[in-house]
From Swiss-Prot:
Annotated organism of origin: Mus musculus (Mouse)
Gene encoding the protein: Znf568
Protein name: Zinc finger protein 568
InterPro entries listed in its UniProt record: C2H2-ZF_domain-containing, KRAB, KRAB_dom_sf, Znf_C2H2_sf, Znf_C2H2_type
Record's keyword terms, sorted: Developmental protein, DNA-binding, Metal-binding, Nucleus, Repeat, Transcription, Transcription regulation, Zinc, Zinc-finger
UniProt note: domains: KRAB domain 1, but not KRAB domain 2, is required for transcriptional repression. Both contribute to interaction with TRIM28. Differences in repressive activity between KRAB domain 1 and 2 are likely due to amino acid differences at multiple residues.
SUPFAM superfamilies membership: beta-beta-alpha zinc fingers, KRAB domain (Kruppel-associated box)
Length: 671
């Protein structure tokens, strides 16, 4: 992967810099020959065998494209052996003896220090080489990519510190050293990290562009300085650009430090980077910045990168990357760079992208009325209505409407869960899932209904609840007339009538309707009880069980039967009780015809016919037909008597025993 990161970094450098640099150098200084060896990456047999087919295809495409770029600008005359091999679809690792690039990490760091810092030690700062991520970008990175980013940033800061070029420690370095997520810095410094590229390139006065071109020419007059800057940028950004390799072999550019250049140079570099694509047109027509991939790739990456459109000129920018973040070059004075930053961040001609405006959502779905910031977001949403799912998982065959959803699904097969809960140890694939899970422990319910004041942990729960107020379409079961607010809930309910249980437990073979029910059941085998009562310390497998138990301490019974006035601690108990009044007993025994209110009661009854007693006491070997009976029996061995009479202090194993005992004090006879 390190070789692949080098290659991806060199691909971006060659595509962006080879042609414009040659044009500028022709006017200002004698050309310096760049050979294929200067930008090629050779692989050993071991490295080649470790690469996946998609990575090999990416390597082949990049090497051939790099060679094509060098031939175009006249920097390569003879065709290297590795190109012959790649064109004939042969493995290129046979050229192991010609390895010449980055023989060791120590040598690479030595070159970086000697070239990148030799002639610009006076002006180079950490801000010139740092790379920032937003929260959305940070969540797109895998765990290994985040470790790579952390190592590169700390290594850069260490190099600057050894050369006495760092005065104070930046906040992003402090966060990385503490093991915290560095995207938090974005909240306070957004304007500095994301200056508006449009206000600079679309200047009304053409003399500003001409002045910028003249400055570019002056910067290229010093070969040593420019060469050192180029090498320094490549060394710093090489590994990070390689981490965003698209799984179909496409390269998604990571957030990199951009070089200021006029539109004419930018368009030339864009044409060379993507041969065969549409050339950039004039100022009045639609233009696309360098941060965008080719048209085919861009369509595949819209789910990962939110595009924002410029209102006046139709320019499209990738808001998920930081390619537009402009850092001052070391040759410029601090005063000039600060002036440019302030002009780009809040100048009079600045036009903010629409996605940044937040409230404006001009693109509306005709099916459901939902609005979006960009046409690409609307396009992805419309796939849900038409049922289009072009992205298919090769492991299980499941299809998804966007590539981002497919990437997240792949973690199910790899079992990659990087975000762990400190309370119960449960791991999640996304930080947003972890934040939602932590609300179970904290009891936080931030989503409140304005109609009735009821609060919910998740926005999805609130959305379903709002349907009850709005009188929206309701889904009714034809077998028992039970009504649900969405079709998915009805589908799960209908499995209780058909007896279908597709999710099987590997430990005991028990089947369940949904995977969430299976996960709850598996805690029976592990003995895990993550939900603890703060009053008595008792543990529970589910948060709902804990909430129900806590009402026993408070005496709260908010659910009341309208028929007899009896109160209950939860809605399920109320629903079960109401069947006593209605006489509804939908679960019938096939052996004797006896009917039951609950399905669990039918299951326990069927064991009386079969004689099955699956619950065995480990102390005395006695077996029971129900788990609750086993739990009661085990209290005999432990001596636990949790039900205590407040009148005389006598304790009992069961609550029913306490109820019978209390009649002695009240003088009430049992019916």
């Amino acid at each position: 992967m390190e070789r692949l990161s080098q290659m991806a970094g060199r691909r971006a450098w060659c595509a962006e810099d080879s042609v414009p640099r040659q044009e500028e150098e022709d006017r200002t200084r004698p050309s310096k020959t760049v050979t294929f060896k200067d930008v090629a990456v050779d692989l050993t047999q071991e490295e080649w065998q470790q690469m996946k087919p998609a990575q090999r295809a990416l390597y082949r495409d990049v090497m051939l494209e790099t060679y094509s770029n060098l031939v175009t600008v006249g920097c390569q005359v003879t065709k290297p052996d590795v190109i012959f091999k790649l064109e004939q679809a042969e493995e290129p690792w046979v050229l192991e003896e010609e390895m010449f690039w980055r023989r060791s990490p120590e040598a690479a760091r030595g070159r970086m220090k000697s070239f990148a810092f030799k002639d610009m030690a006076k002006d180079l700062r950490f801000e010139d080489v740092v790379i920032y991520f937003s929260l959305e970008e940070w969540e797109c990175l895998r765990h290994s990519h985040r470790n790579l980013y952390r190592a590169v940033m700390l290594d850069n800061y260490s190099n600057l510190l050894s050369l006495s070029l760092a005065d104070t420690k930046p906040r992003v370095v402090s966060l990385l050293e503490q093991g915290k997520e560095p995207w938090m810095v974005m909240r306070n410094e957004t304007k500095i990290w994301h200056p508006d590229w449009v206000s600079r390139t679309e200047a009304k006065d053409s003399s500003k562009i001409k002045t910028l071109q003249e400055k570019m020419a002056k910067k290229h007059t010093c070969p040593t300085l420019e060469d050192s800057k180029t090498r320094g940028d490549r060394e710093v950004t090489r590994e990070l650009e390689g981490q965003q390799v698209h799984q179909e072999g496409h390269l998604r550019q990571a957030a990199v430090t951009s070089v200021e250049r006029p539109d004419s140079v930018q368009c030339t570099a864009h044409r060379e980077a993507h041969p065969g694509g549409k050339p950039c047109s004039s100022e009045k027509s639609q233009k696309t910045s360098l941060c965008q991939p080719p048209p085919i790739e861009r369509e595949q990456l819209h789910s990962k990168a939110k595009a924002s459109e410029h209102a006046q000129h139709g320019k499209v920018f990738n808001s998920c990357t930081s390619d537009t973040a402009v850092h001052p070059r070391p040759q410029e004075s601090r005063k000039d760079s600060e002036r440019k930053k302030s002009a780009l961040a809040g100048g009079p001609d600045t036009s903010k992208p629409q996605s940044a405006q937040g409230s404006e959502r001009p693109h509306k779905c005709k099916e459901c009325g939902k609005a979006f910031h960009t046409p690409s977001q609307l396009s992805h949403h419309q796939k849900l209505h038409v049922g289009e799912k072009p992205y298919k998982c090769q492991e299980c065959g499941k299809a998804f409407p966007s590539n981002a959803q497919l990437s997240l699904h792949h973690r199910v097969h790899t079992d990659e869960k990087c975000f762990e809960c400190k309370e119960c140890g449960k791991a999640f694939m996304r930080p947003s899932h972890l934040l939602r899970h932590q609300r179970i422990h904290t009891g936080e319910k931030p989503h409140k209904c304005k109609e009735c004041g009821k609060a919910f942990r998740y926005d999805t729960q609130l959305s379903l609840h709002l349907l009850t107020h709005a009188g929206a379409r309701r889904f009714e079961c034809k077998d028992c007339d039970k009504v649900y607010s969405c079709a998915s809930q009805l589908a799960l309910h209908q499995m209780s009538h058909t007896g279908e249980k597709p999710h099987k437990c590997k430990e005991c073979g028990k089947g369940f309707i949904s995977d969430s029910h299976l996960l709850r059941h598996q805690s029976v085998h592990t003995g895990e009880t993550p939900y603890k009562c703060k009053e008595c310390g008792k543990g529970f497998r589910r948060g709902s069980e804990l909430a129900r138990h806590q009402r026993a301490h408070s005496g709260d019974k908010p659910y009341k039967c309208k028929e007899c006035g009896k109160s209950f601690t939860c809605t399920t108990e109320l629903f079960r009780h109401q069947k006593v009044h209605t006489g509804d007993r939908p679960h019938k025994c096939k052996e004797c015809g006896k009917a039951f209110i609950r399905r669990s009661e039918l299951t326990h009854h069927e064991r009386s016919h079969s004689g099955e007693k699956p619950y065995e006491c480990k102390e005395c070997g006695k077996t029971f037909g129900r788990g609750s009976e086993l739990s009661r029996h085990q209290k005999i061995h432990t001596g636990e008597k949790p039900y205590k009479c407040q009148q005389c202090g006598k304790a009992f194993i069961r609550g029913s025993h306490l109820t019978q005992h209390q009649r002695i004090h009240t003088g009430r006879r049992s019916e």
